[in-house]
């Protein structure tokens, strides 16, 4: 007898969210299809990875074109697409949205990352580097989720997620969402950053 996808999954993959109940085989736009032919509306979007939908012809063509030209060389080297995206992001940031220009003016620096956790880790490191020793504290929101690395887990405002990994890094405090007074109460001279992900 042939093992089911669920059985095969259980044999080789770690169940950080338990055993997945569905095996998806393809997607189209906002829809997913499982191995039994059932159709689902994809509200999760691969945790925001597939926000443009599944199998979008222009996205698929751009990926295929880039993969057939140059797949990846790390950030130790320059590629033209990397420059084009960074320059475009820089222009958008400097111009602001609508009639509002960036009040900071000038150009920043773009740092590409592989995941949200890695981006948050970089933000935490940049805050520490900017402020130096003594201002390493971070205020984040209760019930937030910032990633699975140790620092982003500490920033995550869900104590039940901290427990299996104690001791977690220190210096993180949490305040209620939509409560400016609670955020202000959490501030102190050692706080160097506020980490909020509203989307």
Predicted segments, located by residue:
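Active-site core of PLP-dependent enzymes with the aminotransferase class I/II
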Residues: 199
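PLP-dependent aspartate aminotransferase-fold enzymes
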Residues: 90-196
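Electropositive phosphate-/nucleotide-binding environments in soluble metabolic enzymes
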Residues: 3, 22, 26, 53-57, ...
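A secondary-structure boundary/capping signal
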Residues: 28, 43-45, 141
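Residue-level recognition of short loop/turn positions
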Residues: 35-36
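Active-site-adjacent loop/helix segments that line or gate small-molecule/cofactor pockets in enzymes
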Residues: 1-31, 88, 176
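Glycine-rich loop-to-alpha-helix module at the N-terminal edge of alpha/beta enzyme cores
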Residues: 11, 39-133
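Glycine-centered loop/turn positions within well-structured domains
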Residues: 30, 47-50, 181
């Amino acid at each position: 007898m042939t093992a089911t996808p669920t059985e095969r999954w259980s044999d080789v993959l770690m169940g950080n969210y338990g055993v997945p109940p569905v095996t998806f085989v393809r997607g189209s736009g906002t829809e997913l299809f499982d191995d039994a032919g059932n159709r689902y509306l994809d509200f999760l979007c691969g945790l925001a990875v597939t926000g443009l939908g599944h199998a979008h012809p222009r996205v698929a063509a751009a990926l295929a074109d880039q993969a057939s030209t140059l797949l990846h060389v790390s950030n130790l080297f320059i590629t033209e697409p990397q420059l084009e995206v960074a320059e475009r992001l820089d222009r958008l940031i400097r111009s602001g949205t609508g009639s509002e220009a960036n009040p900071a003016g000038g150009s920043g620096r773009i740092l590409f990352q592989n995941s949200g956790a890695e981006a948050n880790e970089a933000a935490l490191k940049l805050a520490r580097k900017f402020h130096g020793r003594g201002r390493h504290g971070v205020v984040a929101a209760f019930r937030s989720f910032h990633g699975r690395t140790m620092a982003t887990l500490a920033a995550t405002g869900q104590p039940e997620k901290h427990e299996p990994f104690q001791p977690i890094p220190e210096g993180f405090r949490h305040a209620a969402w939509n409560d400016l007074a609670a955020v202000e109460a959490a501030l102190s001279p050692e706080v160097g950053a506020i980490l909020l992900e509203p989307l």
